[in-house]
Amino acid sequence: MRNSITSSIAHLELGKRHRIGLELPIKTRFKNPKNRMKTCSRREEEAPPQESLQKLIAYQISQGDSAPIRPAPRERRWMEDAEEKAPYRCLPLIVANQYGWEILSTHHVRASWDGTSTYEGLCVESLGGDGPLHCYSHFGEGVLTFQIPFLFKTPRGWNLMVRGPTNSAKDGIQALDGIIETDWAHSTFTMNWRFTRACTVEFAVTEPICLFFPIRRGVLQMFRGEFRMLEADLEFESKFRKWSASRNQFLSGLEKGKPEVVAQGWQKDYMQAAKQRKPLAHPFANENAVDRARTGECGP
């Protein structure tokens, strides 16, 4: 099957380019070095100094052809609907939900696939929306393609990881992942979803159709995985054993219905980072606002 992330088709109009800048922190610092993770994450990150910020630019290719970009939110509908909103107790979920930026659909799209491999086997229609329709059948094989109306540029050595919205399963269709070398590539890319069966799916107006975030090129080659017994690191083992004993004691108390444990509901000592309600990612802004942020200037 063809690559899931590819250059946009040739009929994409190349018009006046506008750019939207973003400040991307490349490192953060702890307010208090002792305020580290007790069992999972106790870190409270302070804003990085302005000189450590780098730009992630989204060049708008054509006048009148755009799409909303927002920091990925912490909330998910299925998490909201769960009993007592229990999934929000999982810190890894909350952090992952917010890791990146989402591109939103500009149309209410209905797509139907008949199960065949031809591109004619996928029918796409707009049920309403503004601007050009960015969704169509191009590759066949049950792949639904969203045209992205931006050309992204990252600093040297940085790629973009492009995928579907995190922890947001969609019945009947699956987002395909891709990594774009946006520090040198001067071609656009498409976001693609592949049907898992012959069916009809819909994407609502402002529904996320793409999530992206920067990743440093070559970082995998910097690591060498190795196996060790936990007892090889006595301090690390001691911390784990204390956590494990505490967790087992808590779960035993729940099972036995101990009032003080039931009243507590769940252990919260690893949830410090989740108390920070601010999005992890900075919102996109026009280039003048970004430049003022870098220099510390004020004003509209």
Regions found by a protein language model. Give the residues of each.
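Aromatic sugar-binding surface patches on proteins
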Residues: 184-192
